[in-house]
Amino acid sequence: MHAISSAAPAPSVRLPFYRQLYFQVVFAIIIGVLLGHFQPEYGAAMKPFGDAFIKLIKMIIAPVIFLTIVTGIASMSHLSAVGRVFGKAMAYFLTFSTLALVVGLVVANVMQPGTGMHINVAELDQTAVKGYVSKSHEMTLTGFALDIIPKTLISPFVGDNILQVLLVAVLFGVSLAMVGDAGKPILDFLDGLTKPVFKLVNIVMKAAPIGAFGAMAFTIGKFGLGSLVNLAELVLTFYITSAVFVLVVLGAVARACGFSVLKLIRYLKAELLLVLGTSSSESALPSLMEKMEKAGCSKSVVGLVVPTGYSFNLDGTNIYMTLAALFIAQATDTHLTLGHQIALLLVAMLSSKGAAGVTGAGFITLAATLAVVPEVPVAGMALILGVDRFMSECRSLTNFIGNAVATVVVSRWENALDADRLHRVLDGEAEFLPEPERAVEPVVLARHRA
């Protein structure tokens, strides 16, 4: 086992603002908006830059998740801790995902954003939503469960299914722990491999401003600034609801666990701006895992909670689903009884678990939900297709913050959180702290505090 270093950290010079990632991403987003607005054709042509950055991120997601989980599990003192962490994480995910669905449902009933539109479903152009609906038919509960199991041990690393990588990593990590000392050379190799992989993450993240520029220039060039105010009441309602959920609900959970959600958001500002620019919470997944470890969360907890949360803890997507479904019902004068709304809630609880952290997944999941609840016309999705791209940013931001909070909370529940380090990092002392020991076990952290 490893002890936490008590040596005084070497002083570090704060980078000038123009060399900090968050400033570069903000600047890139502004340039992208201006280009897309004044030169829409050139702006739309910038799409490959955003796509290329997302592909670079996806290239490193699988090895980051695999190495973090395997080395984290294999270094645990007791394998029962793996099941305990997973159980606590799933309990948290189920509770707050359901709460997010309920919040969206309540807000839609109170604000009534679609009332008064009186849309005739027969007059809607359904062509644009057919692709989403056809994809949604593939999203059955059985299909989702079977899709978690890869065809081979190698196939998860050449696909884009995070849960397949998670499954293989957990099984391999448990197997490595069970063989004891015989597996130590492999564990040492994987632990050594972690360092260059995370260095690769840092290198890729230097391209984040280019990716954010390309994605934002394309969005504004393709849809125009005018589409930012189209269906403004729905968009504004969704943004306010998500903000209230983060600040009030997640803020209360954070306070109960001894930290500030606002300070956590400030700590993750560069990643949040990247998510905003790319409209994909997946783009910042590797960086989130690295930063949560630096903030004092146990490596094993980070490795289990963050990747799992990207499929099971999507607070923003859940708020969007019930809010958008009721908006469509209100806009098309479709009356939903309390029973219909409860059925919608139950279906959304299941279908939302198949949503990935990529752009457009929330819209596909909404189609899957409406397909099972016949009272709400699926054709009504054409109403929100034009502004869905701009709600996608808010969905991704809320999902990202929700997973960051979940990681700290589960670490706290597991006594696997270095609380002193967390507070110092959130207070802005990150660059003056030594790097955390990557092989520290949760038990060691608990003893250190005692």
Swiss-Prot record:
One of its GO terms (biological process) is L-aspartate transmembrane transport. One of its GO terms (molecular function) is fumarate transmembrane transporter activity. The chain crosses the membrane at residues 25-45, 56-76, 90-110, 162-182, 200-220, 234-254, 319-339, 367-387. It is a multi-pass membrane protein. The keyword Ribonucleoprotein does not apply. GO terms for cellular component: plasma membrane. It is found in: Cell inner membrane. Belongs to the dicarboxylate/amino acid:cation symporter (DAACS) (TC 2.A.23) family. PANTHER family: AEROBIC C4-DICARBOXYLATE TRANSPORT PROTEIN, PROTON/GLUTAMATE-ASPARTATE SYMPORTER. This is C4-dicarboxylate transport protein. It comes from Acidovorax ebreus (strain TPSY) (Diaphorobacter sp. (strain TPSY)).
